[in-house]
Amino acid sequence: YIILLYYVIKQKNRFKYLQLFLIILAVILSDFVTSSIMKPFFERLRPCHNNEINESINLVGVCRGMYGFASSHASTTFSLATIMHLFFKKNKIFIYLFVWSIIISYSRIYLGVHFPLDVLAGSGIGALVSLSIFESQKIYFKNNV
């Protein structure tokens, strides 16, 4: 994250601090939607807390939190990858953030703390939040600058 922060701050454009704010906002909002809205609303148990299947999964580590729909890890990583890609399309290095997001998301399934649908929904929420923020700022600046 420090490297990404450095990359944004070293940009030579007058909107770099606004971009940094919007990147942080996208990640926080993605986490809020999944953790504070979706998980309490759907109350879908994590695989490791589901008595019907928890004996058939290979739990690696500790199972925290009762509910897993949708994955906050997937949401925040895909949110970051999406908004970084949208802001810095010319720099192809940010494509690797999507690879990183996929690895993080897969790890949630592998560790037995999320179902595949939890991760898919989380990644979609993260990408959608970032796309919404990016498009909103484009509309705002088109009309006000």
Regions found by a protein language model. Give the residues of each.
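Generic beta-strand or strand-like secondary-structure segments
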Residues: I24, S36-I37, S79, I83
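Transmembrane alpha-helix/helix-exit interface in multi-pass inner-membrane proteins
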Residues: I28-C48
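Membrane-interface interhelical connector segments
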Residues: F42-G61
